[in-house]
Amino acid sequence: MCIRDRSRKDCVTTIGPHRANVVGVTNSTTQTDNLIKYFSSLASSSYGIFDSGYKYTYDRFNNKFRYIPTNGDIAGLMVRTNVVAYPWFSPAGQQRGIINNAIKLAYNPNKSQRDKLYPQRINAVVTQPGIGTLLFGDKTALGYASAFDRINVRRLFLTVEQALQKAAEAQLFELNDELTRANFRNIVEPYLRDVQAKRGLYGFLVVCDSTNNTPDVIDNNEFRADIFLKPAKSINYVTLTFVATRTGVSFDEVVGRV
């Protein structure tokens, strides 16, 4: 599925564990080991999203309670994020990551277990007192450090690439001259400024001129544009430092020294 998504470039795949990995397993350490073993065998891809969850919920069609995987919920969180925010926002956390209709989880990893799962590309689904059940991670299934190892960055590029592909196709069979290139830039740059204003980008650069549309490129009937994006990054760790200062000390003297 992830390979198909990589070729399509318009979707991602959400993948949950086997039922036997967590349901009916009473030892949480064993559940953790089962998940790591299962997901370690799956290929690296920024078009996949792994999660740990099975939720106990009411099946109204069969009038019974049952465990179901939460990977469908993760897909729903991304749709909800599109509605309440934008695709380049993370679908995890208390703001957009709450999973509905979960009575309990088959596996509710604690912090030490989450710290084992996250480096293995597994996003934990947890239940927190007073908050509910939520997605507590926003990694893709990419197996190495990259901007694309975060869900919001992958979905940002899916959105931008689709939009700009249409702008590029509109240049087909036009003359490859400065007027056409300027027209392309005038389409792309306002769109990217809008994405930046909506917090999806820290910055961008569009290069579409004679530097990349050289005489050889023009003679080959090609049109080239290089688009450089600085994607916004989600917060995965929060550090709070509290310092008690003496009454007579100026804050200017202590700020930056902690």
Positions of PLM-derived features:
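Structured, hydrophobic secondary-structure cores that serve as assembly/anchoring elements
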Residues: 4-258
